[in-house]
């Protein structure tokens, strides 16, 4: 065959191959699987959303081997709304969280993150859903700080925290302001150091302080460093708006259906009106008196947590089996004589009989609460009935509805309860006058004592686990656990 013909054939083969290649390429470009999917579609395709948060008393913590926290529950609600699994990535500081988000290891961050101009340059924020005010905290008994620019003592904040960012801003106005950062301690640890007198001051959000004072009553608010800072979820800035739009939609619905208000009530609705002496006395008695009766509470708490039953008993009698009141109530659970008879209690001053009778009475109140009330709020309605009677509790619900509020939401009903003391309102209800304001305070106090008992019990369990590790001659000190956990979580994310 002539050389010319061979070259032509070779050339034609090349053209044909090029044509086939271009055709395949154009076909691929037109295929759906080649088109990059949106961020939200990617989350749904992999069936999980990765949410970063921070260990702490408001955002995320483990209690009784169960995850809890305002931000955790809200993130779980969002994952359920999307129909995907929630993969929570907990860290110990804002700096760690920001770094994971910046590197794209998270879909979003939910950890009481304050929106600042500097952070807006780095991240996109969802809608604000509550506000906080950072506080300078000091130890009760120490001189109260008066001037942020002339403090005597050391301020320590977690490295990379909102507190550090705020101090940097304040330093522009107060050149003498000095502080130090700690990369190995989180907010709660620094609060404990203030309570123990190891450091003079730290800076925390008011919501964190209010909850932590129930465990460390020595903590005292020194001054407000800023007001009404907005908290929101943060996500990476991308041209793709799908995740952002979804979050906007989610929050809009949750504001409308009252879910966020319900969470706010659950975690922050009972932490106002801190009393140093009362809290300190309670913690002392929880350590000295409660162990004597703990097994009785565990035995007879059938429908509620035994620690809640113990909290009710403390509110009633301060765990005094011989407690008496001028109104005629007696014993650990301060039962009236008719109630005691109805519950089969022969001796109200006998600790076990009183606890058993009080638990039975609470069970009856729980069963009578209308089914329309959410299960996790029924106990607060039952406690109101326990305190002022079932009829008055129902009056408060009816009045709540008449005022255009939700009679099934404790956050609404507790605001209406004090109206039962006002003639303008108690004339309109079936059972008349009631000490509604006292009932509201009663429930709030029980909730505060309950939270403190949960914390104490959790601390005891942690101490017990540490003792078991020591007995096993663990070579790694407890302080080394933290970075290992974080490193392992980050490693797992990276391997995905």
UniProtKB/Swiss-Prot annotation:
Gene Ontology BP term (one): cell wall organization
Ranges for region Disordered: 464-486
Superkingdom in the source lineage: Bacteria
Gene3D superfamilies from the UniProt entry: 1.10.530.10, Periplasmic binding protein-like II (3.40.190.10)
Location in the cell: Cell outer membrane
One GO location term (cellular component): cell outer membrane
Molecular function terms from GO: peptidoglycan lytic transglycosylase activity
Catalytic activity: Exolytic cleavage of the (1->4)-beta-glycosidic linkage between N-acetylmuramic acid (MurNAc) and N-acetylglucosamine (GlcNAc) residues in peptidoglycan, from either the reducing or the non-reducing ends of the peptidoglycan chains, with concomitant formation of a 1,6-anhydrobond in the MurNAc residue
Main EC class the enzyme belongs to: lyase
Active site, UniProt feature: 316
HAMAP family given in the database record: MltF
Protein task: Murein-degrading enzyme that degrades murein glycan strands and insoluble, high-molecular weight murein sacculi, with the concomitant formation of a 1,6-anhydromuramoyl product. Lytic transglycosylases (LTs) play an integral role in the metabolism of the peptidoglycan (PG) sacculus. Their lytic action creates space within the PG sacculus to allow for its expansion as well as for the insertion of various structures such as secretion systems and flagella.
Full protein name: Membrane-bound lytic murein transglycosylase F
Organism expressing this protein natively: Aeromonas hydrophila subsp. hydrophila (strain ATCC 7966 / DSM 30187 / BCRC 13018 / CCUG 14551 / JCM 1027 / KCTC 2358 / NCIMB 9240 / NCTC 8049)
């Amino acid at each position: 065959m002539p050389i010319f013909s061979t070259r032509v054939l070779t050339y034609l083969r090349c053209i044909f191959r090029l044509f086939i290649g271009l055709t395949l390429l154009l076909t691929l470009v037109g295929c759906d699987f080649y088109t990059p999917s949106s961020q939200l579609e990617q989350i749904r395709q992999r069936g999980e959303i990765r949410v970063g948060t921070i260990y702490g008393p408001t955002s995320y913590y483990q209690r009784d081997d169960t995850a809890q926290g305002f931000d955790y529950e809200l993130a779980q609600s969002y994952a359920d709304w999307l129909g995907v699994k929630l993969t929570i990535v907990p860290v110990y500081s804002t700096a760690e969280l920001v770094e994971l988000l910046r590197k794209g290891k998270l879909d979003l961050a939910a950890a009481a993150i304050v929106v600042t101009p500097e952070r807006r340059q780095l991240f996109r924020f969802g809608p604000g859903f509550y506000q906080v005010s950072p506080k300078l905290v000091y130890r009760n008994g120490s001189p109260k700080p008066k001037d942020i620019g002339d403090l005597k003592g050391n301020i320590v904040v977690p490295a990379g925290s909102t507190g550090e960012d705020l101090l940097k801003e304040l330093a522009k106005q107060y050149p003498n302001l000095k502080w130090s950062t700690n990369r190995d301690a989180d907010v709660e640890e620094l609060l404990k150091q203030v309570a123990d007198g190891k450091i003079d001051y730290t800076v925390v959000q008011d919501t964190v302080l209010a909850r932590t004072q129930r465990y460390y009553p020595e903590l005292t608010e020194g001054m407000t460093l800023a007001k009404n800072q907005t908290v929101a979820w943060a996500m990476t800035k991308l041209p793709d708006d799908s995740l952002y739009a979804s979050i906007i939609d989610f929050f809009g619905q949750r504001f409308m259906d009252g879910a966020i208000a319900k969470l706010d009530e659950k975690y922050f609705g009972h932490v106002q009106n801190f009393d140093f002496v009362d809290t300190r006395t309670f913690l002392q008695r929880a350590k000295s008196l409660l162990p004597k009766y703990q097994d009785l509470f565990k035995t007879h708490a059938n429908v509620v947590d035994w620690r809640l039953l113990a909290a009710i008993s403390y509110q009633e009698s301060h765990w005094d089996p011989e407690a008496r009141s001028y109104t005629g109530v007696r014993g650990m659970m301060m039962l009236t004589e008719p109630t005691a008879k109805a519950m089969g209690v022969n001796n109200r001053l006998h600790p076990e009989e009183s606890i058993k009778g009080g638990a039975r009475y609470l069970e009856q109140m729980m069963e009578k609460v209308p089914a329309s009330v959410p299960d996790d709020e029924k106990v607060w309605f039952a406690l109101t009935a326990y305190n002022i009677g079932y009829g008055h509790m129902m009056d408060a619900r009816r009045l709540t509805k008449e005022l255009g509020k939700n009679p099934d939401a404790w956050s609404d009903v507790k605001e209406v309860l004090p109206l039962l003391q006002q003639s303008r309102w108690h004339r309109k209800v079936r059972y008349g006058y009631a000490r509604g304001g006292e009932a509201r305070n009663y429930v709030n106090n029980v909730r505060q004592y309950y939270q403190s008992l949960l914390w104490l019990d959790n601390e005891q369990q942690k101490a017990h686990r540490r003792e078991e590790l020591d007995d096993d001659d663990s070579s790694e000190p407890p302080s080394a656990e933290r970075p290992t956990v974080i490193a392992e979580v980050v490693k797992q994310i990276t391997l995905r």
